[in-house]
């Protein structure tokens, strides 16, 4: 059986944790930050865990993660 290819775009966006879950960046932190509160921006700076309904998609894109 041939080796499975990793989706490079996904590999740059998701990181596997020790427990097998995946972390991701939060949206809404690239531009238009003037009107957002510092608390909001701090919250957006933290990593989020990929939701369980999307986890299978990420696993398929990253077969060796």
Curated annotation (Swiss-Prot):
Biological processes, Gene Ontology terms: translation
UniProt keyword Ubl conjugation, yes or no: no
GO CC, one annotated term: cytosolic large ribosomal subunit
SUPFAM superfamilies with a match to the protein in the record: L35p-like
Keyword vocabulary terms for this entry: Ribonucleoprotein, Ribosomal protein
Domain of life assignment: Bacteria
Annotated Pfam families: Ribosomal_L35p
InterPro entries membership: Ribosomal_bL35, Ribosomal_bL35-like, Ribosomal_bL35_CS, Ribosomal_bL35_sf
HAMAP family cross-referenced by the UniProt entry: Ribosomal_bL35
Family to which this protein belongs: Belongs to the bacterial ribosomal protein bL35 family.
Name of the protein in question: Large ribosomal subunit protein bL35
Natural source organism: Parasynechococcus marenigrum (strain WH8102)
Name of encoding gene: rpmI
